[in-house]
């Protein structure tokens, strides 16, 4: 599975966890069916293990927004991206940012992709 697909599947799992208060294992199982992808699982597990810290990074960068006003898709995608940016050294920040914008265009809308771009641009140093 390519990393883009792993990110999309991770977003879907995080969305299920957020929306349905589903367990991490059940969400991964629902999304992956009989497949397995280590990177996808690493993303979901990493976001959930560091959720409070990730939210603390996101919240001050929302510019007149509150986290409880964000759509579940946008919030899940921001968490996923912040995890990649701050916790994984093998993904350049620019790649994570661009992937998030493209995934937002698929699962959310143009307005959300611009919003996500703005939030992540404040969070992600460009030199990694």
Curated annotation (Swiss-Prot):
Classification via Gene3D superfamilies: NusB-like
Keywords of this entry: RNA-binding, Transcription, Transcription antitermination, Transcription regulation
Keyword Lipoprotein: no
Pfam families: NusB (PF01029)
InterPro entries linked: NusB-like_sf, NusB_fam, NusB_RsmB_TIM44
GO cellular component term of the entry, any: cytosol
One GO term (biological process): transcription antitermination
Protein name, entry field: Transcription antitermination protein NusB
Name of the encoding gene: nusB
